[in-house]
């Protein structure tokens, strides 16, 4: 039986005064692309990230270091309000560093920050559409008939009503928690496959895109934990005639967003077409199971683009083509991407490569 939170028992303890001290929850990406966290007490309200200490953890237990040299260091990178504890308590997104001061192998933020600094005059904006699938604690899709299947896809996308959407209360809790925390969440919707949902984060400039998406993911898995529900970011969690899960990446630069920007968008698409394989390499594991040319995807083996074409690698929204400026949508990234890798390679390809 899955463990369930006793929120009614916890509530009076969370209401107790803390004095001047606060709790800071350090959050980091582990060696397998998952999320970990642990808490420390800080003597006063944090107003400057520089006042937070560099901490450490046992990297041999997170697939980030060998046992004989297991200390990995956490350097604070971004702060968000803590929706679980409230008050002045905070969530601290941290980068991971090895004992010799080099970035850990899963610290993709380090490189991305350098890339975004080089491109800052172009003011790159991103908006990520994070799809995910919910499962019961026993591993069955949440809300599906035990040992069976729901009706075929059709009524579930942006659906309303019993039997069409599942776990809306969990999704609403996540949405409100993101707003409280300061995450730039811009929307939610039920997706094409039952028990699949999407939230959108952005627009965010530069390195903040990865920061906001990772923390939004953390809030989602923490809240789902309270519901005794599992969150899957696998790009094809269920085989058969079901949609996969992606993380469509909307991208623009200052020049793209200004009148006449369509020409810049077309130039960017041409550059992206020449590095298709390099992008696919960092666009998520098992993405070949999703990018089949079916279920609103382009084929993983070929680059394509088009206006309003959801079967293309790159989609230009119809309203963007009509007005002559705006943004493009890269539909190739899978739901399990590291956003730092995706946003940095897009900037490298379109802005920094000769």
Swiss-Prot record:
Task: Give its localization.
Answer: Cytoplasm
Coiled-coil blocks: none
Q: Which Gene Ontology molecular function entries are recorded, alphabetically?
A: ATP binding; glutamine synthetase activity
For this UniProt record, the keywords arranged alphabetically read as follows:
ATP-binding, Cytoplasm, Ligase, Nucleotide-binding
Q: Which part of the chain is the GS catalytic domain?
A: 108-354
Query: Do you know which SUPFAM superfamilies this protein is assigned to?
Result: Glutamine synthetase, N-terminal domain, Glutamine synthetase/guanido kinase
What does the annotation say about its assembly with partners?
Answer: Homooctamer.
Q: What is the protein's name according to its record?
A: Glutamine synthetase
Organism of origin is Hebeloma cylindrosporum
């Amino acid at each position: 039986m899955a463990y369930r939170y006793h929120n009614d028992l916890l509530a009076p303890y969370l209401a107790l005064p803390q004095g001047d001290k606060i709790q800071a929850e350090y959050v980091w990406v582990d060696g397998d692309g998952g999320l970990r966290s642990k808490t420390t007490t800080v003597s006063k309200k944090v107003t400057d990230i520089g006042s937070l200490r560099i901490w450490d953890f046992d990297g041999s237990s997170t697939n980030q270091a060998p046992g004989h040299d297991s200390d990995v260091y956490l350097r604070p990178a971004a702060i968000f309000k803590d929706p679980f504890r409230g008050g002045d308590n905070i969530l601290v997104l941290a980068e991971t560093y090895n004992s010799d001061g080099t970035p850990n192998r899963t610290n993709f933020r380090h490189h991305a920050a350098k890339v975004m600094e080089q491109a800052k005059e172009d003011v790159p904006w991103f908006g990520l559409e994070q799809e995910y699938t919910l499962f019961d604690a026993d591993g069955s899709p949440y809300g599906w008939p035990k040992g069976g299947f729901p009706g075929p896809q059709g009524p579930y996308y942006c659906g309303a009503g019993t039997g069409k959407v599942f776990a809306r209360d969990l999704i609403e809790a996540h949405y409100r928690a993101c707003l409280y925390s300061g995450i730039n969440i811009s929307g939610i919707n039920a997706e094409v496959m039952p028990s699949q949902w999407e939230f959108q984060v952005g627009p965010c400039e530069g390195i903040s895109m990865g920061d906001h998406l990772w923390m939004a993911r953390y809030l989602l898995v923490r809240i789902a934990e309270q519901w005794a529900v599992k969150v899957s970011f696998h790009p094809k969690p269920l085989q058969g005639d079901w949609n996969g899960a992606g993380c469509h990446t909307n991208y623009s630069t200052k020049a793209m967003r200004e009148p006449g920007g369509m020409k810049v968008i077309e130039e960017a698409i041409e550059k992206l077409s020449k590095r298709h394989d390099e992008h696919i390499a960092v666009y998520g594991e098992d993405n070949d199971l999703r990018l089949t040319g079916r279920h609103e995807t382009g084929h993983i083996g070929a680059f394509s683009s088009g206006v309003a074409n959801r079967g293309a690698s790159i989609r230009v929204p119809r309203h963007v083509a009509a007005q002559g400026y705006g943004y493009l949508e890269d539909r190739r990234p899978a739901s399990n991407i590291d956003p730092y890798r995706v946003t940095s390679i897009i900037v490298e390809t379109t802005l920094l490569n000769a």
